[in-house]
């Protein structure tokens, strides 16, 4: 019997599904193929791993590094055994095949291209009806029923669960990327189902309380931290001073054109490599090696650093990160195959004297900077504050290697490859 191209594409897609459970690579998203899959309007039933963490949470150097990789939670009670897990896998396979068999050949090819590229290549949107009838396809076992009886499934959620994060349970755990046609649209008739046009959301382990007007002293450079160089020194003249209050004219990045909303500096240990990169477009890819890459290519910068560790980390940057300015702030999406580490004044408790370093796994997004919170952290009437650079509009990002209290590196200037992102006022 001859096999059609469509059936071959379906089998190839199923073989490309994300591994689950113990087979999963670190940071890729796991937790087994079973479990409930709720639609957009269903109640949130996220399962959290041991230690109070969850698959969508961001680990930090002072807390538990909760991984979206290893599936420590169990969709079924342990007493259910392998039989229940196998049944859930069979249900998922039957449902996925019933969906894929309804797609046109061109749609299958587009989906396969996105899945096999793992997000490294820009792929088109896969526009499909957003919801799917919950009844299983003809390949389902006799009498098989879904684990939960919602009226319909979210199709983007199903494809993300199959091809990216097997432990995914609810639409509130993912965020659509701004490059997608469905970004910002509410309940469109057709929605993009390309699994690499969505990212997994990082949740802080404990949300910060309301921000006070006159908060923390740790935003000032301190004499007892010689390696914690303030941003004005690190970026060669970039300065943030706020004498007498807040205004656009007082928060300057560099003289001249103010059309850019941030500048990016790339560092290898204590040495800045290349020039400052001014960002004007709403979205910027920062990468070392990216097929069809368009943005800030770190691989093209001339570096004299011969350290084996620096060269090793540099080779792991790969697709890097995506920096996006959106309505609610600035988001960072980890496109690489390794974790990144982020420190930002707007991510943490303003009453703390130490900023946490947040670990962001591959495929995850985090809102790294919030303009309104940054404004509230300034002290315009503080005479001492007026005399020193203020670093609240700066975010630091390290590739692969972390720093802070739980690491041998106490300061980011000891990290092999890292970025300093300095934001303009809007």
Swiss-Prot record:
Its main location: nucleus. Induction: By TGFB1. Changing residue 64 to A: Loss of acetylation, and of SMURF1-dependent degradation. Zn(2+) binds at residues 125, 180, 192, 197. One of its GO terms (biological process) is positive regulation of cell-cell adhesion mediated by cadherin. CDD domains: MH1_SMAD_7 (cd10494), MH2_SMAD_7 (cd10500). A motif (PY-motif) lies at residues 208-211. GO terms for cellular component: centrosome; chromatin; ciliary basal body; cytoplasm; cytosol; fibrillar center; heteromeric SMAD protein complex; nucleoplasm. Interacts with WWP1. Interacts with COPS5. Interacts with NEDD4L. Interacts with STAMBP. Interacts with RNF111, AXIN1 and AXIN2. Interacts with PPP1R15A. Interacts (via MH2 domain) with EP300. Interacts with ACVR1B, SMURF1, SMURF2 and TGFBR1; SMAD7 recruits SMURF1 and SMURF2 to the TGF-beta receptor and regulates its degradation. Interacts with PDPK1 (via PH domain). Interacts with TSC22D1/TSC-22; the interaction requires TGF-beta and the interaction is inhibited by TGFBR1. Belongs to the dwarfin/SMAD family. This is Mothers against decapentaplegic homolog 7. It comes from Homo sapiens (Human). The lineage of its organism: Eukaryota, Metazoa, Chordata, Craniata, Vertebrata. The gene is SMAD7.
């Amino acid at each position: 019997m001859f096999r059609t191209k469509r059936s071959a594409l379906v089998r190839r897609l199923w073989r490309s599904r994300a591994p689950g459970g113990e087979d999963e690579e670190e940071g890729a998203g796991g937790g087994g193929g079973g479990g409930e899959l709720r639609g957009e309007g269903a109640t949130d039933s996220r399962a959290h791993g041991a230690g109070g963490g969850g698959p969508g949470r961001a680990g930090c150097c002072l807390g538990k590094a909760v991984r979206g990789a290893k599936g420590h939670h169990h969709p079924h009670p342990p007493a259910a055994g392998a039989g229940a897990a196998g049944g859930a896998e069979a249900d998922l396979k039957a449902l996925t095949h019933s969906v894929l068999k309804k797609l046109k050949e061109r749609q299958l090819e587009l989906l396969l291209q996105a899945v096999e590229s793992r997000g490294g290549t820009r792929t088109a949107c896969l526009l499909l009806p957003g919801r799917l009838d919950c009844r299983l396809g003809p390949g389902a076992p006799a009498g098989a029923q879904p684990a939960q009886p919602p009226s319909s499934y979210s199709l983007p959620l199903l494809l993300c669960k199959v091809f990216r994060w097997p432990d995914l349970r609810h639409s509130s755990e993912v965020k659509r990327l701004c490059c997608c046609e469905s970004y910002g649209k509410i309940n469109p008739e057709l929605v993009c189902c390309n699994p690499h046009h969505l990212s997994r959301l990082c949740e802080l382990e404990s949300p910060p309380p309301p921000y006070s007007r006159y908060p923390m002293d740790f935003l000032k450079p301190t004499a007892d931290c010689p390696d914690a160089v303030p941003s004005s020194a690190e970026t060669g003249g970039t300065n943030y001073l706020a004498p007498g209050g807040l205004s656009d004219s007082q928060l300057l990045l560099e003289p001249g054109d103010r059309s850019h909303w941030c500048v990016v500096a790339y560092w290898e240990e204590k040495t800045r490599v290349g020039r400052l990169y001014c960002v004007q477009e709403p979205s910027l890819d920062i990468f070392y090696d990216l097929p069809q890459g368009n943005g800030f290519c770190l691989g093209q910068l001339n570096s004299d650093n011969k350290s084996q560790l620096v060269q090793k980390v540099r080779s792991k940057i790969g697709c890097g990160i995506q920096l996006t300015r959106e309505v609610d702030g600035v988001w960072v999406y980890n496109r690489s195959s390794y974790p990144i580490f982020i420190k930002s004044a707007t991510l943490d408790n303003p009453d703390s004297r130490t900023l946490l370093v947040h670990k962001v796994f591959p495929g995850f997004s985090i809102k790294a900077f919030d303009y309104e919170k940054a404004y509230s952290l300034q002290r315009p009437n503080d005479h001492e504050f007026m005399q020193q650079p203020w670093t609240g509009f700066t975010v630091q990002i390290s590739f692969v290697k972390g720093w802070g209290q739980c690491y041998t590196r106490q300061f980011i200037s000891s990290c092999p490859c890292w970025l300093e992102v300095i934001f303009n006022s809007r």
